[in-house]
């Protein structure tokens, strides 16, 4: 204490050796904020709901609505969640929109790097699907996942491809796929149609997708009646945007039991 008084006599009574810290005789509690893992990605801000995909004879169709939900609020109503990767591959993503934008930037740079080589090679749907499984599993293993579920569709060497990857890196291929709430509402309708007719035509597949989008708009609070449809055939990729489905709410007063 004598040495402390000597310091105070030189620097003044208000001088502290450790500003903001403990004083002699006091207990000091180490602040805990900032010492835990980063958790930004565990709280997605703007999210998109279902993405649907179905194979048809000669190609693949993917569809997604254009709503970005900020929590429970329908905040952004014209955002795209379908991406043309190249002339044979298209990607659709549900989940956190910021993570999707990051993925999109990475993939676009990969495509540019591949084109600079100039060897005529391009990423096939199956190659992109395999790469996505590694990316998602790697981020999940770092406890910092990309909060997305992705559907990749395309045509390569005359063969249609439709693959699924979630934020844990779980991946599989199927003739019909749906993410988000669509996995519960749209997938049964898609499977029923494809099991009854495995060789759907392009028009039949499109009508089926539009029917499922309408069901989702009626039943999914995070869905919207504006949507995009991507069609992939040997001729290339075509994305039609800002389409709108016609709805009829005349029977809404008859719906009960959900109050």
Residue ranges with predicted function:
Residues 1-259:
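Long, low-complexity N-terminal extensions
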């Amino acid at each position: 204490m004598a040495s402390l008084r000597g310091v105070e006599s030189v620097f003044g009574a208000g001088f502290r050796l450790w500003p903001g810290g403990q004083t002699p005789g006091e207990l000091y509690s180490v602040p805990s904020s900032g010492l835990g893992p980063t958790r930004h990605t565990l709280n997605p801000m703007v999210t998109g709901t279902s993405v649907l995909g179905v194979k048809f004879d000669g190609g693949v169709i993917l569809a997604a609505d254009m709503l970005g939900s900020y929590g429970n609020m329908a905040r952004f109503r014209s955002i795209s969640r379908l991406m043309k990767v190249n002339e044979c591959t298209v990607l659709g993503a549900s989940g956190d929109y910021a993570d999707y934008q990051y993925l999109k930037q990475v993939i676009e740079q990969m495509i540019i790097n591949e084109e600079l080589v100039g060897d005529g090679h391009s990423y096939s749907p199956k190659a992109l699907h395999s790469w996505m499984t590694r990316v998602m599993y790697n981020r999940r293993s770092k406890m910092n996942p990309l909060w997305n579920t992705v559907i990749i569709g395309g045509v390569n060497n005359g063969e249609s491809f439709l693959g699924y990857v979630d934020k844990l890196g779980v991946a599989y291929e199927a003739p019909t796929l749906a993410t988000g709430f669509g996995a519960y509402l749209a997938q049964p309708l898609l499977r029923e149609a494809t099991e009854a007719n495995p060789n759907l035509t392009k028009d039949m597949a499109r009508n089926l997708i539009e029917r499922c989008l309408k069901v989702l708009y009626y039943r999914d609070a995070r869905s919207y009646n504006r949507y995009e449809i991507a069609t992939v055939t040997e001729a290339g990729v075509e994305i039609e945007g800002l389409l709108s489905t016609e709805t009829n709410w005349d029977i809404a007063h008859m719906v009960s039991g959900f109050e």
